[in-house]
Amino acid sequence: MIVNVETLISMTEFHGLKESELSQKLKAIELAIRAYTNNNFQNRNVRFEAKTYSDKVYGSSPFLRVGDTIQISKSGVNDGIYTITEITPAFIRLDTRYLFAVDNNLITKVEYPVDIVQGVINLMKWEVENRDKVGIKSETLSRHSVTYFDQDANNTVMGYPLALLGFLQPYMKARF
């Protein structure tokens, strides 16, 4: 996961939100960023093949830690990104219960640069503070009037204001 849920919960903007809700939003943002940039942020120096079953990868690397994100590929059925929850000498436990038994999975560590992490925190703040105001252009109550930034197809990407996504520009990869 790009940002640890506990990190967000410690911030005042996210007090009162459920861990599961934050986790789900973070996973959605992570997948959206990977698709939008066409960049999987893999550290190909930390890569190995291993068997999978249930919630375990039967293999390891000395360069992986609890909380790291890995990508499983070339399995046919388990492809995706997962977070490590436990590491033992025999296996790595992931944040899922539904890995199919496959003998050859390519496991690669995923690392996000610091500016991506900060950008995701800013996106999450926007999500919490402004998502419910999307679609409302202005409000008036008696003599008090509030006008919001107009969001249309020209200035939004993936449901977020284009100005908030500038941090992704250096990581865009060409699509062929």
Predicted features along the sequence, with ranges:
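Short acidic, Pro/Gly- and aromatic-enriched capping/linker segments at domain boundaries
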Residues: 129-137
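Non-catalytic terminal accessory segments
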Residues: 147-149
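Conserved short "hinge" loops at termini or chain/domain junctions
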Residues: 1-118, 131, 152-176
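Glycine-rich and polybasic anion-binding loops at the starts of cofactor/ligand-binding domains
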Residues: 121
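Short Cys/His-centered divalent metal-binding micro-motifs
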Residues: 124
